UniProtKB/Swiss-Prot annotation:
Belongs to the EF-Ts family. It comes from the Bacteria. This is Elongation factor Ts. It is found in: Cytoplasm.
Amino acid sequence: MSISPQEVKKLRDATGAGFGDCKKALDAVGGDFELAKKKLREMGIASADKRSGRDAKEGRVFSYVNKERVGLLLISCETDFVAMNGDFVTFGNSLIKQLVESGKDSLDEQQELEIKNLAATIKENIHVSKIYISNIASNELVKNYLHGEQSKIGVFIKLRVDDVLKIEDGSLNSLTMDLALHVAAFAPLYLSVGDVCPNYIKEQEEVFMKQMEASGKPENVIKGIVSGKLKKHLGEITLLEQGFVKDDKLTVKEKIEEVSKSILTKIEIIDFKYFSVG
């Protein structure tokens, strides 16, 4: 029999389940409203979707890397207790592995259903908040890092070298791992100053100028101070200009140049990502 949109909407309003799930449930039971509600409960969908309005401010970051790709996944939940739950952790590790191996940065219907079933089992609002997948070329080296027992911070960084034979070099691998730790510690927003939106730079400059208006200093002095403040601020939010985590006398850019000279090949950061809970 044909299921009308009005019937689907009625079931959706009653259960909070998604339009597609309601249509499937009604089709499965020949359009019987009560049986369709029961079907959704059996699937764990209705109860999970009713919880979807609750705040999910906790969670966990998952990561996986193979020879072809690296990925990060942030799954949100309501409590840190659930973020430590064995079923939750096992599911997250399995899901990020599936995503990396497939190269997909979005969930398919089966994966969406598995999340709803997990939410129904654990009885919390659980959802995927972020996914990021990045390919790895033969001359690129990746390190990922999850911080702490609860993995509330997860990062990866990807470096490229001109000489592919240097990929296994110990100094390069140590640098890459140190840079992953650096990203976790300092959470840069951009790779370089050139990546920062010009409008943001202009707005920030105006903020600093406003702050100096009441100083009474000459205009040329104010401009110099503002220029210094802006340079310092951009250095704090861009990875290459930040002080290196293991030696803040060097910027990250200078540390990369140092290692590059020592192993006789050009090194550059081409991608990084920082995920955090909350």
